[in-house]
Regions:
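Protease-associated
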Residues: 247, 254-328, 337-341
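Short cysteine-rich clusters marking metal-coordination/redox-active sites
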Residues: 187, 402, 473, 516-519, ...
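Acidic, turn-prone loop/beta-hairpin segments
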Residues: 95, 184, 188, 194-202, ...
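Alpha-helical recognition segments enriched in aromatics with Gly/Pro capping
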Residues: 313, 346-358, 462-464, 487-637
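Residues immediately within or flanking Cys/His clusters that coordinate Zn2+
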Residues: 184, 399, 468-470, 513, ...
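Residue patterns forming the tRNA-binding/recognition surfaces of aminoacyl-tRNA synthetases
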Residues: 2-20, 26, 30-34, 106-243, ...
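N-terminal catalytic cores of NTP/NDP-binding nucleotidyl/phosphoryl-transfer enzymes
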Residues: 42-103, 164, 234-242, 249, ...
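Cys/His-coordinated zinc-binding microdomains
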Residues: 191, 461, 477, 520, ...
Length: 924
């Protein structure tokens, strides 16, 4: 007789090979036919709301790994909340305006953008942005991200622009917006102001100079000193700013020394605390401090500029420190915020001797027309020749660069629009207290950034952006922004989009009969030519998209990368507080690290170390990318490399093989009729469910804490340690050899069903494709929605199946004995004493505290140890002896037993197998 036919051999049709790159697109088509997103909302309608507001990626390129990590985490969160009974609307968005798209389209099309009409240029930018929205959307859909992809928000859409105009109007009306001439970050290459969030710092080589400013005054306070020999020594790392010098700042409370170097007929004034350091840099080993005075003593004295025919006033400022330099601070109000405020306090006129392109103006004399970087060596040489250079050094310092063109920027005073953050800073800081921060230090980071920030420069000298909705009266010249003008422009943009601003005259946009609210004249009006900072666009999304189109505010959660503390998190907070007069627009704020290569380096094209999500989809499948995101501690930088994905493939296969084992052995099992009650289950099976309960609790806690890597690692450990290495090995004999519908087999199948059902639900937020594939292949209870695992809640622990703690302690001891037995069996195999473990008989000695093992049924214990025979005695310590089993090998189950052949008519079978075969009435 061919006994193989009598075995319950695993069969389910669930493939061992995943074939994800081919199988996943089929699943995407299934989800599309199912209308997964909308069906999910219908299923959970009326349940508690969880709203994750999408931070809009920039629509200027294909997906990169940073996009993939961010969207994967968002999908994990939304799916996990949906499967815990929440209503989870999710509207994806895109940030469309700004310099990155202008730069990209100019580079791509080699356009002379200045020769193009504004309308044509903006149309080209719009088409470019739309193209990459489609590219990115397809990539996110390929990842399996569940969202309303047919109705995303775009910051360039007319409706959004109209609502953003109203946000600007609210902030203006609240008195927080003004126009002023003050220093801002300026990119000479792109000829526009920049926000702090658009600045990147790089280490650059630099020549730092110590410069002598000769005393100009008649020395009424110092009559005993020779004016012609006396100079103040300043220090700067930006030589090109020296033509803009108007003052030298001293700390009023610090002591300043008049210093005479040995062998030189000159006198230098510098901070006494820095004298030794500065004189050393100047090459003077020997010097004399002639006298000292407090900084306040020199206030309003005049020094001569070292190479221009003008003077420099001595002023006082508390920000002058003794950390570096000379204590005499070069002050150019056109190039620094502190400089500007100090000179403003002393009533000095603003001087900006550099134009939009970073070239010196006529004010700089012989350097007029030179770019700032070109003038540095020329000015340096001129100072050397004139004898005004005290010393110079070559250093490397951290210098700001434009985030888009990567070129050095300058600090330059220009007329700009600002949001006065100072006027509502305290409210913004207080709003941070009501937010759950993940990680917790996020609160202090954002609070400190808001506390330290200056006013927000919100104007840009660009054409691809939302126009600043302000008019100017031609008669009085004052800016105009009222409820009436805001309503008119918002209504116009709603109908025609913001291109109307560039295509229509001011009078045609304003209400008929409109007059200037300042002077009452109707002589004519002009439009503002600047556009709004892109951070104002994205900072308005919580109002312009979430509240006005979705109907709820604030969002439950914001989640973005670490850089968004100074970007989107901050701009959203400032708009919410400054414009709307509310608190933070999010209840929870979560951040993740950067994506880096396997060595921890940033990924750059020049290094060739980047990874393309599309290539990962094609090589490994989207579920492997999701597993990468779900297995990484995203609070720090997340590494990705081909080696990492190969390792993840092994972890993935462990889970897939676990699911396959369950599915293969659940063929013919109906949970509606075949589930075994806890009291009727074998204790081993209840042990497995009790271990599952521990996993469920850990997974729930991990999802609550957004620790997705803990979810993945816990499930992987459960599959490897509890199931594959222990439980599955033991129950194979029961599953394959016991009667198909026997109580013992149904007991094991009950445990397998509960395990598979719970694990599939728990892992579904992360392994979306694979868990859906499992769900569609597995048996279900009538209460389940078999269409998608996402339509079902995660299970709670099966408390009714749980073993008491003392029983679990016994099983821990059994597992320890099994480990010892396995070691002894390995040695016996190596010694050729036995072949397979079922050929063995083991003698086990256990210490007194484990005496319960001696009382266990010998056959049951042999099954647990996967040997044919076992004897247990109580002694001093745990020992194991292995010998060949006594008896004959059963032709069906392969156990070696003395009872084989004792059933009449079944000479080669053990009694258990004989009974099963007899019941099947199988004839060869």
């Amino acid at each position: 007789m061919e006994y193989k036919k009598t075995l319950n051999m695993p069969k389910s049709g669930f493939p061992m090979r995943a074939g994800l790159p081919k199988r996943e697109p089929e699943m995407l088509r299934y989800w599309e036919q199912l209308d997964l997103y909308n069906e999910l909302l219908k299923k959970n309608e009326g349940k508690p709301l969880f709203s994750l507001h999408d931070g809009p990626p920039f629509s200027n390129g294909a997906l990169h790994m940073g996009h993939a990590l961010n969207k994967a985490l968002k999908d994990f969160i939304n799916r996990s909340y949906a499967m815990r009974g929440y209503y989870t609307p999710y509207i994806p968005g895109w940030d469309n305006h700004g310099m990155p798209i202008e730069s990209a389209i100019i580079k791509q099309n080699k356009l002379n953008h200045k020769a193009m009409s504004v309308a044509d240029f903006r149309t080209a930018c719009h088409e470019f942005a739309d193209h990459y929205i489609d590219v990115q959307r397809e990539g996110f859909k390929r990842m399996g991200v569940v969202a309303d992809w047919d109705h995303p928000y775009k910051t360039m859409d007319p409706g959004f622009e109209a609502r953003e105009v109203r946000v600007f109007g609210k902030m203006y009306k609240n008195g927080h917006i003004y126009k002023g001439l003050k220093p801002v970050y300026w990119c000479p290459h792109d000829e526009t102001a920049l926000a702090e969030a658009e600045i990147e710092y790089q280490d650059d080589p630099c020549t730092t100079v110590y410069v002598k400013f000769p005393m100009h005054d008649d020395l009424g306070k110092l009559p005993h000193l020779d004016k012609s020999k006396l100079s103040f020594v300043i220090w700067t790392t930006t030589i090109w700013t020296l033509p803009g010098n108007l003052a030298i700042a001293l700390n009023p409370a610090e002591s300043y020394a008049v210093v005479k170097p040995a062998g030189r007929d000159e006198l230098y004034i510098m901070a006494e605390a820095l004298t030794e350091k500065v004189m050393g840099i100047g090459g003077f080993d020997s010097y004399e401090i002639v006298e000292t005075h407090p900084g306040a003593f020199f206030e309003n004295m005049l020094a001569s500029h070292p190479f221009l025919p003008k003077t420099s006033r001595l002023v006082l400022a508390d920000y002058v420190t003794m950390d570096s330099g000379t204590g005499c601070v070069h002050t150019a109000p056109g190039f620094g915020a502190d400089d500007y405020q100090t000179c403003l306090r002393y009533g000095m006129d603003m001087v900006v001797p550099v134009d939009d392109q970073g070239r010196h103006t006529d004010y700089a004399g012989k350097y007029a027309g030179m770019k700032t970087e070109e003038s540095n060596p020329v000015i340096l040489q001129d100072m050397k020749e004139a004898g005004s250079l005290f010393a110079s050094q070559e250093i490397v310092h951290s210098y700001p660069h434009c985030w888009r063109c990567k070129k050095p920027i300058i600090f330059r005073a220009t007329p700009q629009w600002f949001c006065s953050v100072e006027s509502f800073k305290d409210d913004a800081i207080a709003a941070c207290e009501d937010v759950r921060w993940v990680p917790s230090w996020g609160k202090d980071r954002l609070r400190s950034m808001v506390l330290e920030r200056t006013d927000w420069c919100i104007s840009r000298q660009r054409r691809w952006g939302l126009p600043i909705p302000v008019f100017y009266c031609k008669d009085c010249g004052k800016p105009i922004c009222t409820d009436e003008t805001i309503d008119a422009i918002a209504g116009l943009f709603e109908k025609k989009g913001s291109n109307a601003w560039f295509e229509m005259e001011a009078e045609d946009m304003l209400p008929e009969g409109f007059t200037c609210p300042h002077c009452g004249k109707a002589a004519g009006f002009e439009k503002e030519t600047d556009t709004l900072d892109g951070w104002f666009d994205s900072g308005s999304t919580h109002y312009a998209s979430m509240e006005r189109t979705q109907g709820f505010w604030p969002a439950t959660m914001y989640i973005e990368g670490l850089d968004q503390y100074r970007g989107w998190f901050q701009s959203s907070l400032l708009v919410a507080v400054g414009a709307l007069g509310r608190g933070a627009p999010f209840k929870e704020c979560l951040t993740h690290g950067w994506t880096v290569d396997g060595q921890g380096r940033a990924m750059h094209k020049s290094l060739g170390n980047g990874m393309d999500p599309a290539e990962i989809f094609n090589k490994y499948g989207a579920d492997l990318l999701r597993l990468w995101a779900g297995s990484s501690d995203y609070h720090v930088d997340v590494r990705c490399s081909d080696d990492i994905f190969k390792q993840l493939s092994q972890n993935y296969l462990k889970f897939r093989n676990t699911a396959k084992f369950c599915l293969d052995n659940l063929t013919g099992f109906d949970p509606e009729t075949d589930l075994v009650a806890p009291a009727d289950m074998q204790e081993l099976d209840r042990w497995a469910v009790t271990r599952l309960n521990s996993l469920i609790r850990r997974v729930f806690d991990s999802y609550d804490a957004y620790e997705f890597h803990a979810v993945s690692h816990a499930i992987n450990d459960f599959c490897v340690v509890d199931l594959s290495s222990f439980y599955f090995d033991i129950i194979k004999d029961r599953l394959y050899c016991d009667g198909e519908r026997s109580a013992s087999r149904r007991s094991a199948q009950t445990a397998l069903f509960l395990i598979l059902d719970a694990m599939t639900r728990m892992f579904a937020p992360i392994l979306a494709f694979t868990c859906e594939e499992i769900w569609l292949a597995m048996p279900h209870r009538s209460a389940d929605d078999s269409r998608s695992v996402l339509f079902n809640c995660m299970v709670q622990p099966y408390e009714g199946y749980a073993l008491p703690e003392d029983a679990m302690d016994r099983w821990a001891k059994i597992a320890a004995v099994r480990t010892a037995v396995n070691g002894a069996l390995e040695q016996a195999r190596a010694d050729k004493t036995i072949g397979k473990s079922l050929e063995a008989e083991v003698d086990v000695t256990v210490p007194a505290e484990d005496a319960f093992l001696a009382d266990m049924d010998a056959d049951t214990l042999a099954d647990l140890l996967i040997v044919s025979q076992v004897r247990v005695t109580v002694g001093d310590a745990l020992t194991v002896t292995v010998a060949p089993a006594r008896g004959v090998k059963c032709a069906r189950c392969w156990k070696v037993l003395t009872s084989v052949g004792t059933v009449e008519g079944h000479d080669t079978l053990c009694p258990r197998c004989a009974a099963v075969v007899k019941s099947l009435s199988v004839v060869e």
